[in-house]
Amino acid sequence: QYNYQQTGNFRTTDLNFSVARVGDELANYLIGYGFNVVHDKTYHDYPAYTGSYTRSKATVENILQSNPTDIIIDLHRDAIGSKSNYDPSVKIGDDVAAQLMFVIGTNGGGLYHPNWQTNLKFAIELEQKANEMYPGLFKTMIVRNSRYNQHLGKAATIIEVGSTGNTLEQCMTSMKYLSKVLDEYRK
């Protein structure tokens, strides 16, 4: 078995020990709150990162044909560096949760991205709601000059879940709180 707490470019195709497992946790919580969820676990970055956004774009477009939505969450684990034990976490009640971080793409790289300001607004509002409910759950968001397929939705974002130093349990705990924030946000 693999330990989720690895560093560098460690990847596994074992869904029980990857960010896909964290996505399962988020999906289960959101379904419990009445959200309609499609959780795709296709490996787009294995065996290589090159071309992963092209491959994932095709997957998302196919999903959107039969399940139209504006909310698209692309969960990642932040790979801080190969020698880092950095584990951004926050204590919420008796729980230790991995901190989350939005990564929002823009049209700054020259690619068509008409929704980037709407996506940014969504992330800002969700982060504000999270700060009201669970201060420290989110780190400061990053805005980049790439679009990360976020042009496909009006509430599309990457959410980095912890880092290579966080445990799987901490990352899964974060999903409990993220799902509550999403539920409150939509009310």
Predicted regions and their residues:
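Non-catalytic propeptide/linker segments at domain boundaries
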Residues: 1-5
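Envelope-exposed proteins and targeting segments
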Residues: 33-35, 69-71, 96-100, 153-157
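Extracytoplasmic/secreted envelope proteins and their assembly/folding machinery
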Residues: 23-27, 57-61, 120-127, 172-175, ...
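Second-shell loop/turn segments in exported
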Residues: 6-19, 42-54, 60-61, 108-117, ...
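Catalytic-core regions of hydrolytic enzymes
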Residues: 13-89
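Active-site-adjacent mobile loop/cap segments within catalytic or ligand-binding domains
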Residues: 138-187
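Active-site-adjacent substrate-binding region
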Residues: 115-142
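A short, glycine/acidic-enriched catalytic loop
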Residues: 80-115
